[in-house]
Swiss-Prot record:
GO biological process per UniProt: cell differentiation; cellular response to oxidative stress; mRNA processing; regulation of alternative mRNA splicing, via spliceosome; RNA splicing
Expression across tissues: Selectively expressed in brain, cerebellum and testis, and to a lower extent in kidney.
UniProt name for this protein: Splicing regulator RBM11
Record domain RRM: where: 10-87
Amino acid sequence: MFPAQEEADRTVFVGNLEARVREEILYELFLQAGPLTKVTLCKDRDGKPKSFGFVCFKHPESVSYAIALLNGIRLYGRPINVQYRFGSSRSSEPANQSFESCAKINSHSFRNDEMAGRPSFPVPFFPITSAALPQEYFFFQKMPWYAHSPVLQPPFCEMPAPLPNSVPGSCALNHSPGPEAGPSSYEWTHQPPSDPDLYPRNKRKRQRPDSDSDSSSEDKRGNEGSQKCRKCKKKKRY
């Protein structure tokens, strides 16, 4: 077999590509089907990428598997078209028969899986890389309303339960439905303690300054009286 024919049998045609698709994205995507040797994204005379390209595998068996695995998946919202390359020995084969041919090629490995007790058709694993994801995905992740949207959370906002009234000096949230404050405004209010034993103590504490003032006034009166007595004694002496 000629080298050109051999390379054509190891290459797939990838069409209907979006303008933002790069060769690195195609490499990460088609690497799931097998090892690659070359990824080419066709460009026009101005250097702008066209809507198709070619992916060359290391083994020809990977071509049928890549068509069965990746044909029709969406890149940037557009389904890609994966076919045999024109000029290959299997280019006339319809795309819907690629899965059957892939099953025939890998029938030996499937039989070994059945002997080992594993399922005959293993589920392929699709690793998601940052290069294969559109930029809009990361843009919406960074938006604050994306992670804290009230629609995604429980009904509106669940406020924390207020502290029990038995705790002295506790505070609670009261809803104020005023037109200026808005329908969802809250204000802090101080709740007096419900323990009746605390009030006499406060009264006693308040009475202490009064008694002190009374004693000070009595002392003043006593001083004034003593001064008057001294004046009277002086007058009697004279």
